[in-house]
Amino acid sequence: MDVKRFKRVFLIVMDSVGIGEAPDAKAFGDQGAHTLGHIAERMNGLHMPNMAALGLSHIRPIQGIEKVDKPKAHYGIMQEISSGKDTMTGHWEIMGLHIREPFRVFPNGFPEELLNEIRELTGREILGNKVASGTEIIKELGDEHVKTGALIVYTSADSVLQIAAHEEVVPLEELYDICKKVRALTLDPKYMVGRIIARPFIGADGNWERTSNRHDYALKPFGRTVMNELKDAGFDSIAIGKISDIYDGEGVTESIRTISNDDGMEKLVRSMDQSFTGLSFINLVDFDAKYGHRRDPIGYGQALEQFDQQLADVVEKIGEEDVLIITADHGNDPVHHGTDHTREFVPLLVYTRGIKEGKDLGLRKTFADVGATIADNFQVEAPSIGTSFLHEL
């Protein structure tokens, strides 16, 4: 049987849009989690006609989302095999890597042992050491930082260590140097931090403003991803939103920054007017950062409905030689206890122009099936995990 190949693959990761607890959810403290289901309940039904038309309620029934007779997309559900439930783990697995050692998160701040090592390395004291919003923590500790020169260290629900400092108190070059040293320290398996972020700010007397001189010191993926294979074979690999940061630029031919989900979707639509051969890959982070961690189911629901409206433009622009894949990287149920991600299945929707009636792609045993399918499509080396579903399209 002839396999249809596509010139362009558009991959949308709806950050944290899980679709029900994974079989191993109990091990993560996530029994009963269902990001989409619980948001729909709190919203008294989600209004997402475009996702409904693609077949979302064929994966799992979601309140308010009609189960259409003939879905316009193929649909399935994916289970993560890697041992974490964070953004990097989910995305790296999508592109073909199996993460056996999870990145660590620090909901109660960093261990004193690490803080002492940072003090020794830098000769500076430390303020904060807690989970915080970047704008809130400089509001709270900015004055003390300026007085003492101590570093403001904080984290989030993700595997990150962020260091905020006033540009006139800790010059940029010094801050970057500190972050590089901390990056080296935190490669130790007992810390295993995904990203170190320099967060410079300016201002005076409590009126602080973060500058655009932020710098991320990520981990490079420990193996080759499908994006590396595409780039090396001469295909385009366009990263929209925080995709380039997640893979530390590996396998990226063009990086497009975004400031919000709306902005990301607009930039995705614009990228569809470009002539290219390869992958256009976007992460929509607001679902996770603005609503999931903040346990705001109504805000999350409204953001999903807004995404659905913008999705109509994407679907309309899909040409004969294009394929659109929509999925997620983990869950973040905004009615679940705590503020962390949740271990869940993720939805899979695959749309091409020629589908008369979408079929069930079944349970995919790893997120890497997406990467394997993309590799198969462009006939580059397949990842060591994952099964292509290209022939089913």
UniProtKB/Swiss-Prot annotation:
Coiled coil: none annotated. Binds 2 manganese ions. It comes from the Bacteria. Mn(2+) 1 binds at residues 15, 329-330. Its cofactor is Mn(2+). One of its GO terms (biological process) is 2-deoxyribose 1-phosphate catabolic process. Keywords: Cytoplasm, Isomerase, Manganese, Metal-binding. It is an enzyme of class 5 (isomerase). Pathway: Carbohydrate degradation; 2-deoxy-D-ribose 1-phosphate degradation; D-glyceraldehyde 3-phosphate and acetaldehyde from 2-deoxy-alpha-D-ribose 1-phosphate: step 1/2. GO terms for molecular function: magnesium ion binding; manganese ion binding; phosphopentomutase activity. GO terms for cellular component: cytosol. Mn(2+) 2 binds at residues 288, 293, 341. It catalyses: 2-deoxy-alpha-D-ribose 1-phosphate = 2-deoxy-D-ribose 5-phosphate; alpha-D-ribose 1-phosphate = D-ribose 5-phosphate. Its EC number is 5.4.2.7. Disulfide bonds: none annotated. It is found in: Cytoplasm. Its main location: cytoplasm. Isomerase that catalyzes the conversion of deoxy-ribose 1-phosphate (dRib-1-P) and ribose 1-phosphate (Rib-1-P) to deoxy-ribose 5-phosphate (dRib-5-P) and ribose 5-phosphate (Rib-5-P), respectively. Belongs to the phosphopentomutase family. This is Phosphopentomutase. It comes from Halalkalibacterium halodurans (strain ATCC BAA-125 / DSM 18197 / FERM 7344 / JCM 9153 / C-125). The gene is deoB.
